[in-house]
Design a protein with these regions (language model features):
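Acidic, turn-prone loop/beta-hairpin segments
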Residues: 156, 168-169, 194, 273, ...
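Short amphipathic alpha-helical coiled-coil/interface segments
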Residues: 134, 329, 364, 368, ...
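NTP-handling and nucleic-acid-processing catalytic cores
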Residues: 1-36, 109-143, 147, 181-182, ...
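Structured, non-catalytic alpha/beta "coupling" segments that mediate domain-domain communication
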Residues: 69-103, 322-345, 436-444, 508-542
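Residue patterns forming the tRNA-binding/recognition surfaces of aminoacyl-tRNA synthetases
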Residues: 2-161, 241, 277, 283-284, ...
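C-terminal low-complexity, glycine/proline- and small-hydrophobic-enriched intrinsically disordered tails
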Residues: 445-618
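A glycine-rich phosphate-binding loop feature that marks nucleotide/adenosyl-phosphate handling sites
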Residues: 76-87, 152-160, 264-271, 309, ...
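Alpha-helical recognition segments enriched in aromatics with Gly/Pro capping
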Residues: 1-3, 27-39, 146-149, 153-159, ...
Length: 618
């Protein structure tokens, strides 16, 4: 309530607003219900008895004006609920008799397993939400005024006391009649005098029995199926029904089976549109999944959404997600066609291929261990991202390029066999995320027996990866990238074989891969690089590519002079900042250290460029 809004007074209508009802109970306010069941005005409003609620609203204002009771009328925004099935009909809360289930007992039996991590939530942040809700549990209204549903199993007996209801709860009318005749005064009651409650049970009251009723565990307790399948391992659901369904299944599990219904609960994110709104039928903001599948493919849609769906985090949907999934599908198809298109011959395995096979085997084992760790912690999106990068970057961009034979040349059998084994393993790892393309390609990767499917193909135990070899390959990528940058900057054709100078020598077991992917003639170990060479650093190691005979010297001098002028200007700005005593004294230590590093880097770069210019001008 805001003291400066409207009258500054609070209107409380306990019979017509859920919040007001709670407030009325707290302060013992009178409950006045002005509506009849047919939405006409009740006898509580004598002037308008029998009038439709909407018509009544139209005449009340003129009546108040005529009585001189309106000081002024102001427009303001209000939230009015409308029927989902008839958008022109406003919905009004109304008091009526409801059935409730006492919940304290159920909360007491469902709290410990989550508190003690016997039943785990993924992500764990929902554990506190669950605990707080159960600790402040309210009784559950289990009746609904619906045409369809499981009917409330209550039968009312006739009575002259309007303040007191007499009823029995029974499985059917025969049982109800039997129970009713045991009540004093109703010994001769007939079945026709019983009135079956017209309300239906809340949908969730049926759903909370799902893990049990699915295997007939209520009517046939201890049967073979319920003993085998209960409790199950994992439940996948949305966080917005953690109270409606998850908590209540746990309650029912302990109540009827004496055990939790599952060991883990994985909460997916809520899919929202670009504006952050939850997708719903009423908003019409949900794309047609069949149209998405037709446009991007089933695996494309599935994989794109999985990549964007960290556990428990909402997804801001965009078609670009599915497009990314489709592009990845295309990448897999193209890699498959490339590999299956190679001609195989009994030729010697090139050294670059041998090194590439050795490296990728360890890279695959490293990724396999990471994926298994993500799966064990229910980080499915992270697992998908590891596989996405493994296939797109490591396998396609680096491994296949390292082993690809020269144009018109065959592939050696050892490398081809290893490549097919790697492809097989990649398809197995990707299968849970992309079932259709992986099944299709796996069937064509090798000869298969009838009925054989990738669904039954096992993922082997991971072997500890050689981290030193993986680090060596990381250096290879930087060295190859450095040489490619030199080619681009100096406009050197890809066909031209270059020499790479490694100052202090190259200590890398994957040297043959560098030579092949960088298009090198050789790698020379030198104590001092050629001053006219294009240099670059990989960590603390210095490399250089001699280019004197391959470039336009005058153009290179102009470019170096321009770069030198810019770097000197940059150094001057850094010096100015470091010469400011107030900056050095007051700025965070890390910021000052970063500026000093910029100064040192600029000075080193200037010295290198001056040296190169001097060599070019000779």
């Amino acid at each position: 309530m805001e003291i400066d809004f409207g009258t500054g007074c609070l209107k409380v209508t306990p019979a017509h607003d859920p919040n007001d009802y709670v407030l009325g109970k707290t302060h013992n306010l009178e409950t006045i219900d002005i509506f009849n069941a047919d939405a006409t005005i009740s006898e509580q409003s004598p002037l308008y008895v029998g009038m439709d609620r909407l018509e009544c609203r139209k005449v009340i204002v003129p009546d108040l004006k005529n009585a001189g009771l309106i000081e002024k009328i102001e427009d303001y925004d209000n939230k009015v609920g409308y029927s989902e099935r008839n958008s022109d009909t406003p919905v009004e809360p109304r008091l009526c008799m409801q059935w409730f289930l006492k919940m304290k007992h159920f909360a007491d039996i469902a709290l410990p397993c989550v508190k003690n991590d016997e039943l785990k939530f993924h992500p764990a942040k929902y554990k506190n939400i669950y605990n707080v809700w159960l600790e402040g549990i309210q009784d559950w209204c289990i009746s609904r005024q619906l045409w369809w549903g499981h009917r409330i199993p209550a039968y009312f007996l006739p009575t002259d006391d309007e303040e007191k209801e007499v009823y029995v709860v029974a499985m059917n009318e025969e049982e109800a009649l039997e129970k009713a005749r045991k009540i004093p005064g109703y010994e001769n009651i007939e079945a026709s005098q019983l009135r079956h409650d017209e309300d239906a049970l809340d949908t969730w009251f049926s759903s909370w029995l799902w893990p049990i009723s699915l295997f007939d565990g209520i009517n046939n307790p201890g049967n073979e199926e319920i003993k085998y399948y209960y409790p199950t391992n994992d439940l996948v659901t949305a966080p917005d029904i953690i109270f409606f369904w998850v908590a209540r299944m746990i309650m029912a599990g302990y109540e009827y089976m004496g055990d939790m219904p599952f060991r883990n609960v994985y909460f997916t994110g809520v899919v929202r549109d670009k504006l952050g709104r939850k997708m719903s039928k009423s908003l019409g903001n949900s794309p047609d999944p069949l149209m998405l599948i037709d446009k991007f493919g089933a695996d494309g849609v599935r994989m794109g959404l999985m990549l964007a769906a960290p556990a428990g985090n909402d997804i801001l949907y965009d078609d670009a997600l599915c497009e990314q999934g489709r592009n990845f599908n295309n990448k897999i198809w193209n890699a498959f066609r490339l590999v299956k298109g190679w001609e195989v011959a009994d030729v010697e395995q090139p050294e670059a291929s041998r090194q590439a096979v050795e490296w990728f085997r360890h890279q695959l084992n490293d990724a396999l261990a990471t994926v298994k760790d993500h799966f064990s912690k229910f980080r499915l999106s992270d697992a998908m991202m590891v596989l996405y990068r493994l296939f797109w970057e490591e396998f396609s961009a680096w491994y296949l390029e390292a082993v690809k034979p020269a144009f018109g040349q065959p592939m050696d059998r050892a490398t081809m066999q290893a490549t097919l084994e790697f492809f097989d393993m990649l398809l197995r790892l990707l299968h849970p995320f992309m079932p259709f393309i992986t099944e299709e390609l796996w069937q064509h990767l090798d000869e298969r027996k009838d009925g054989e499917s990738i669904m039954y193909a096992l993922i082997p135990e991971d072997v500890e990866a050689d981290q030193a070899l993986l680090k060596a390959m990381a250096d290879v990528k930087e060295i190859v990238g450095g040489v490619r940058n030199v080619r681009k900057q100096k406009n050197l054709p890809n066909k031209e074989q270059l020499t790479l100078q490694a100052v202090g020598g190259l200590n890398n077991p994957l040297e043959a891969i560098i030579i092949k992917l960088a298009g090198l003639e050789k790698i020379d170990a030198v104590t001092e690089k050629d001053p006219t060479a294009a240099a670059f650093m990989v960590g603390t190691a210095e490399f250089a590519v001699p280019v004197a005979g391959s470039i336009d010297v005058e153009e290179e001098i102009k470019k170096l002079e321009a770069d030198l002028e810019y770097t000197r200007g940059f150094l001057a700005s850094v010096d100015k900042k470091l010469s400011n005593e107030r900056f050095v004294a007051n700025a965070p230590e890390a910021v000052v250290a970063n500026e000093r590093k910029k100064k040192a880097d600029a000075e080193s770069k200037i010295a290198t460029m001056e040296q190169a210019l001097q060599a070019l001008r000779k």
